[in-house]
Amino acid sequence: MKKPFTGLLMKRGTLSSFRNFIQLFSLQSRGLSFSTLTDTRPFPDYSPKKASVRDTEFVHQITNVIKLRRAEPLRRSLKPYECKFKTDHLIWVLMKIKCDYRLVLDFFDWARSRRDSNLESLCIVIHLAVASKDLKVAQSLISSFWERPKLNVTDSFVQFFDLLVYTYKDWGSDPRVFDVFFQVLVDFGLLREARRVFEKMLNYGLVLSVDSCNVYLTRLSKDCYKTATAIIVFREFPEVGVCWNVASYNIVIHFVCQLGRIKEAHHLLLLMELKGYTPDVISYSTVVNGYCRFGELDKVWKLIEVMKRKGLKPNSYIYGSIIGLLCRICKLAEAEEAFSEMIRQGILPDTVVYTTLIDGFCKRGDIRAASKFFYEMHSRDITPDVLTYTAIISGFCQIGDMVEAGKLFHEMFCKGLEPDSVTFTELINGYCKAGHMKDAFRVHNHMIQAGCSPNVVTYTTLIDGLCKEGDLDSANELLHEMWKIGLQPNIFTYNSIVNGLCKSGNIEEAVKLVGEFEAAGLNADTVTYTTLMDAYCKSGEMDKAQEILKEMLGKGLQPTIVTFNVLMNGFCLHGMLEDGEKLLNWMLAKGIAPNATTFNSLVKQYCIRNNLKAATAIYKDMCSRGVGPDGKTYENLVKGHCKARNMKEAWFLFQEMKGKGFSVSVSTYSVLIKGFLKRKKFLEAREVFDQMRREGLAADKEIFDFFSDTKYKGKRPDTIVDPIDEIIENYLVDEQLRGAN
């Protein structure tokens, strides 16, 4: 049972950091002073240029024409007046028709289409739009000014603002006009000018709305160089009358989380309540997402409890964040439960949530669960995107099902989705791991034709596949191609080539290559040295392997468990079991936790030497240390006991292996069947064979020979006739396939 969160009650350490956080919002201001509200001044009177008698008559004529017109367009009605029309006439006509807002807009559009309007007339129409509550038109008119090319921002701002103030009193007197002007400046990134508007409005006794200030705060928070300014603004604006609201706090909480300062964000959530504000779902969801990013699941659950106590229900954003975290830390059962709870609450999961789950299950190798969610998306009419397809394709590639991966890749194109470099690279990687290099290069060519440039990861994947196939010449060609197109091979690229050289027996060439890329400024890593050690161990040069280890340690590189397992395998492979046990004891003494692979090397060699007592002792030792045996452990022990004809023990271990869900190889089935046949346990041999057949595995020629020999010797033919027929069929099919290839 989780302990309930104490809300505003804080531990001493938390209280201390909370005080520090409040001090963060009480920093000295730096050049952000305000004029006091007592120094306010009135808006100026508007005094337009006086019209001459002739101009007055001309304006009167135009006004009558546009007022009396019916359905006739203005361009036709005012055609006779075009040549005499001047900018001053525009303002004088606007004064006559300002009570008819629709007519104002039509006339202003007509005037602007004939000649450029001056800034004064633009400000007048902006005021009239705001007075008519048409804020969208006002915003559009202000934006059109700032969209002009080659505009001197500093001078233009002064002129625009001064004229907006000058025309304010007689043309609208709606303070929202300055909010709109301010917000447009912020949208255009003119933050310094926006700040000046805020300060200048204080001189006239006006404080911009909290919505405008929130727009400003949001823009500041998105600029990594202005986060300090955002904090100062958040602290200072209330001093001159800005009343922050919940949305304001949410903005600050969000950008504090983005800075990675999740504790401070949580403190700000508490500060909201101290100041009398009630956090909403967005407030909590932002902090929850922050804790999810940093993997602090316990704090997430506590915040959820607080939310529920306050009557707030988690939203889709919160569920998505929690599911994402649970998938990242491999708690997929809990992630699935959170998903089910989301559905029960009536919240429809989106593409992001489904993709997160699909990706999580694929990475664990549970392609069945991933596929279930993928096809469930279709049934809910939720469209998979490129990321969704990439995740599921990667999952099928991971288990080697390249047929299904290829089908899904084709399906993407049919649905109009364009794979990105990650999708192409995942598919290429799958084909490379499956040894289908022709298909890998086919996808590589497709990638280039689709206009998607292969990156270092793509080339490294292909190089790795070629090296594992032993085609080092082609791998080197690709390496040179990388250089040619300006891609810099990284340590993963070179490690693939080093591994290929070692696998082909060219250890000295591999060592030479390491020297060359290190001389070029690229440092070898633990994988590089472990690969060289493995090559020397397999060739029996244990002294050189240990020298490589010393060199690696001398460079400050930390060996991994794989490094020690390579050394252990080398000792065991060459009969140096005492050295292997010494290495194991040294690892334990140094606090280096061995894994199943470490113990397996010893178990295997003791089984090969028929020393089942020692093998069993190693097995018991690993179990007592909390290291669970894997499939290889059981295979080694089953084969060892079969070889020693301890069929009872072999059968027990085989059953335990199956019970734990480990896959059994053909060779293990074969050894067990042969063991039972040698001990004349025909029923047991048949039972193992039936299990093998249910797994879809075909017996080899050796098993066929064993059953044949037993049959012709007249030993229990009723138990073996059916298996012989099946073995012959499978064996002949295999032979035909080999002949065809």
From Swiss-Prot:
Major location category of this protein: mitochondrion
Membrane-spanning parts: none
Keyword terms, alphabetized: Mitochondrion, Repeat, Transit peptide
Residues in PPR repeats: 174-208, 209-244, 245-279, 280-314, 315-349, 350-384, 385-419, 420-454, 455-489, 490-524, 525-559, 560-594, 595-629, 630-664, 665-699
Domain of life: Eukaryota
One cellular component term from this protein's GO annotations in UniProt: endoplasmic reticulum
Signal peptide feature range: none
Location of this chain's protein in the cell: Mitochondrion
Pfam families: PPR, PPR_1, PPR_2
Family named by the database record: Belongs to the PPR family. P subfamily.
Name of the molecule in the record: Pentatricopeptide repeat-containing protein At1g05670, mitochondrial
Organism this protein belongs to: Arabidopsis thaliana (Mouse-ear cress)
